[in-house]
Structures are given as C-alpha cells and as structure tokens.
Amino acid sequence: MKTEILQADDANIEKCAEYLRRGDIVAFPTETVYGLGASALDPKAAEKIFRAKGRPATNPLIIHVADKAQIETVAVVDDRSRKLIDALMPGPLTLVMPKKEVVPSIVTAGFDTV
C-alpha cells in the first residue's frame, strides 16, 4: 500500500474520493482526531479498516456523512432523530439509529444500528 500526504485542495479531495470509490482507505482529520475511512457500503473496504487498525470485528465502525440527505441512505431516521439533525447540523453530531439493509453487517459488527 502506497502512502501519500496530500493538501486539502479540490483536486486532492477528488483524488481521495476516487480512492474510496475503488475500495481503498484514506486518513483524514475530524474535529478531534485523525480517522481512517473507507466506503461504508463496501464490505471489503471495511475489512481493510479493521485490519489497518487492529480493530476487533465486534467493535462497529462509525459512518461519517456529508450532509443531512446522506443520513437517509444508511439509517432509518425517526421524528426524534430528525429534530436533532435539523437543529444541530451542519456541525459535529453523533447519533445511533437503525441501519438500512444497504449497510454491510461487517460495518455494524452485526448490530442492527449504525
């Protein structure tokens, strides 16, 4: 695996998006720590995260989303969650919600939530 350090400009963000589309992993800063990321919908990419971090398969992964609409693609959003999302996004927010079938079980460690 080749490691590259990239500046956060439009061209390199698109390059990282292409890495994610092809099933690779990327490191990125969050509000508090650096994270390793992969497509949450690709079970082989999720396996790469578990291997790279030495993470036990019983410990589910976090799914980061770009916006409110993307939440609907991976989770079932009830009225209470929608109120929190509408009040607090954009901005850092962590919610646990029922997962949609599109999310592979490896990502959720077999749990029904994401």
Outline where the language-model segments fall:
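Active-site-adjacent structural elements in enzyme catalytic cores
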Residues: 1-114
